[in-house]
Every structure is written in structure tokens, then in C-alpha cells.
Amino acid sequence: MYTGIILAGGKSSRMGEDKSLINSNVNRLAKEMELHGCTRIIVMCGTLERADLFELECVIDSAESLGESIFELVSKIEGRIQLAPCDAYLADSELFERIDGVPVDDKGIRQPLMANFDSKEMVTKSTKISEVFELFPTCDGGLKARNTNTPEEFREIQCFLKQEDL
């Protein structure tokens, strides 16, 4: 089985609005994951109250930290996993196709929340995302691997969204 997990449970405090609802990106990412070959899509929605925001299968965070919640969810799944944060507005099936491990974006930032891996490879349980994915190989993700945390970053991403070929 090939499972896509969309991370959409954050508070989006720096953005000032819920990033998971901008541009219907959770649904868009789900479609891109399906195009890539994911047969099951799960949204890690954070809390029970947020589950109604999404039309897809939702899972509530099971631990205090995202790292531990991801670890616990992945431990219940067999096969390949493709992660994607809800603020990956440029990610598409072409990007997912070339990810093997943890991609590095065009700014040189490692993006562990966009990792692609076999569930058996997740062996480190930690509260820190960087530690959970530290043993995973790094691969090139380029511009499409960027995530967005502030209104300024989103404006920059919007410029790229207006272009046809990334």
C-alpha cells in the first residue's frame, strides 16, 4: 500500500490564518498524491474539532508533539509513505515522483515533513521532527519542496503559482 499523509493540524500563528484552508490546498495535495499513486490519503488534522474541516480520512494527533504523532501513525501503516505539509502550495505529483528520503528546497532547507519513505524505515521516536528524520537520505526537491509560514512567503509563492512551468 502507498499512503499519503497531509499534515494540517498546526495553529498557523505566523501566517495569521489557517494555512490548511488557503487555496483548498489539502484537497489539491490529495489529488496530486493520488496522481502519484497513493491509494490511501490521511489528513493529520491535529484536534477532533478540526476533523470537520476536511472531506478526507482524518487522524487526530495522538501525542503532544508532531514528531511523536507521526511516528505513532506511521507505525500502524505498512508500505510507502509520502508526507506533505498543508502549506506546500507548489508540491505536485512530479515532485512526489522524485522524492526519495527528505527533500531539500531551493533555499537549501531540508524539508522532513515532505519525506517519502517505507514505513519500516521510521525507527527514531522523538519530539523533534529533525531527529525523527535524521537518518533518512537527503534528495533534491527544489522550489516545489518549499513550505510557507508567513504572509510574505505566501506572496512570493503566489508569484510562482501564476507561472505555468515551475
Roles of regions detected by a PLM:
Residues M1-R110, E131-K144, F154:
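Nucleotide and nucleotide-moiety/phosphate-recognizing core
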Residues I109-K125, P151:
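Conserved nucleotide-sugar donor-binding
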Residues T124-L166:
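Conserved alpha/beta core of the MobA/IspD/sugar-nucleotide pyrophosphorylase nucleotidyltransferase superfamily
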